[in-house]
Amino acid sequence: MRQLLPGDTVWRNIRLATMDPQRQAPYGLVDSQALIVREGHICDIVPETQLPVSGDNIHDMQGRLVTPGLIDCHTHLVFAGNRAAEWEQRLNGASYQHISAQGGGINATVSATRACAEETLYLLARERMMRLASEGVTLLEIKSGYGLELATEEKLLRVAAKLAAENAIDISPTLLAAHATPAEYRDDPDGYITLVCETMIPQLWQKGLFDAVDLFCESVGFNVAQSERVLQTAKALGIPVKGHVEQLSLLGGAQLVSRYQGLSADHIEYLDEAGVAAMRDGGTVGVLLPGAFYFLRETQRPPVELLRRYQVPVAVASDFNPGTSPFCSLHLAMNMACVQFGLTPEEAWSGVTRHAARALGRQATHGQIRAGYRADFVVWDAEQPVEIVYEPGRNPLYQRVYRGQIS
């Protein structure tokens, strides 16, 4: 009989989808197991026959499914306003250029976010965060990028820090100052990149407000030379990098980010084989964002088969934002990744657990159920992991455990 220490907590009588690749079964499944949690971490996984049937801090899950906590590794959670009106305009035939000329597009969100009080932004973002938590998310990336000026970018990152301080969910904050050229720099995008590189990145990094630097390398964003300036600045300061790349065209952004050992290359609909090879060589995760693909009614799909062939880890994320992916649901993103991009359900699960953890640099502590990892996991009223992917409108979450505590 396994001896428990005072303070240990046990979840017994569970069907465990560990997502541990060292286990041979699909999803790393093992039956009739018990989890021992100690000081917020997984202490051990043992057959339930080795434990007492009942006792203090022993939870009988009656055969329910347990998975790692979900990880949403790409969101734009902090913003004000919405873009429903311009979405309706687009569906009625208005072009993106026409909408932008009227002050719409990303600059509409920038204007609303700049004008919004920090406390209001916090309350808006908190509600969104709790929606994701209700689906079993325990680690969440939050990007800035709707300020495009020092003061507002800092405001957005302070909101992310305030959310993290609640200890309801882990937050990985990302500086995305190189998201778009603000209206005041419309005729001088290089000047704006200078502001990002010489002021925003060093000052906000010194304040400890973010974990990584992101950028938008695209025909409607920043070119390769401008993007490389951002990457060089970040790397000189020892900051991890990532990038929105190859979403609408092939510019070579994935190769660029991979040369700087980027954590991830995100979107990647137009990714080519050279880019896939570069990602493999750079250890860069490919992050699929099917919500934006769906909402923009795109037709160019990411090269999933090439990513498999080159064994590039593939993550899946919600990309929750007001303009191109207003879907605050990781379950829906998993379903879309399977239906639209051809992932298997097991690949989708890997994409919101261990591969998503790698995309945030947290692969040594998050995304799997194994000894030594954080005790972040979800108990589901389900028999198989595929059920969560198959029916995204139904949430079978029974219990969410964060840092070893039921939340």
From Swiss-Prot:
Keywords carried by this UniProt record: Cytoplasm, Histidine metabolism, Hydrolase, Iron, Metal-binding, Zinc
Coiled coil: none
EC number: 3.5.2.7
Domain of life: Bacteria
Gene Ontology terms, MF aspect: imidazolonepropionase activity; iron ion binding; zinc ion binding
Classification via InterPro entries: Amidohydro-rel, HutI, Metal-dep_hydrolase_composite, Metal_Hydrolase
Cofactor(s) required, per the database record: Zn(2+); Fe(3+)
Pfam families: Amidohydro_1 (PF01979)
Any Gene Ontology CC annotation: cytoplasm
Family to which this protein belongs: Belongs to the metallo-dependent hydrolases superfamily. HutI family.
UniProt-recorded name of the protein: Imidazolonepropionase
